[in-house]
Amino acid sequence: MNNYETVFILTPVLSDAQMKEAVDKFTGLLKQEGAVIVNEENWGLRKLAYPIQKKSTGFYQLVEFQANPDVIAKLETNFRRDERVIRFLTFRQDKFAAEYAAKRRSLKAKTEEVKEA
């Protein structure tokens, strides 16, 4: 199993429920195919660097997971078929990227603990 990270952008016209349903669809697909989801982050509504499909904003979602390489083809096929996804990028993390991601997650958890206290 390899470590992967995927970021996808959903169209900004979705309601919160529709956005959550779309994210659940893709994470459910990963779990169904035997992937282990390591981290999931909702980056919220952000401005795009350039217009895509005449839209200047989008809902960003990050998912880090461990899976076999054949799962990626199925995931990206579903991204292409879903009209709610306007862009996506999936890449395999090498050992350095995986270490950096783990460090970033632990640092984020520590800052959230400080905010709660």
Swiss-Prot record:
A family per Pfam: Ribosomal_S6
GO CC, alphabetical: cytoplasm; ribonucleoprotein complex; ribosome
GO molecular function: small ribosomal subunit rRNA binding; structural constituent of ribosome
Entry-linked InterPro entries: Ribosomal_bS6, Ribosomal_bS6_sf, Ribosomal_S6_plastid/chlpt, Transl_elong_EF1B/ribsomal_bS6
Single GO biological process annotation from the record: translation
UniProtKB keywords: Ribonucleoprotein, Ribosomal protein, RNA-binding, rRNA-binding
HAMAP family given in the database record: Ribosomal_bS6 (MF_00360)
Family, as annotated: Belongs to the bacterial ribosomal protein bS6 family.
Reported function: Binds together with bS18 to 16S ribosomal RNA.
The protein's name: Small ribosomal subunit protein bS6
Organism: Porphyromonas gingivalis (strain ATCC BAA-308 / W83)
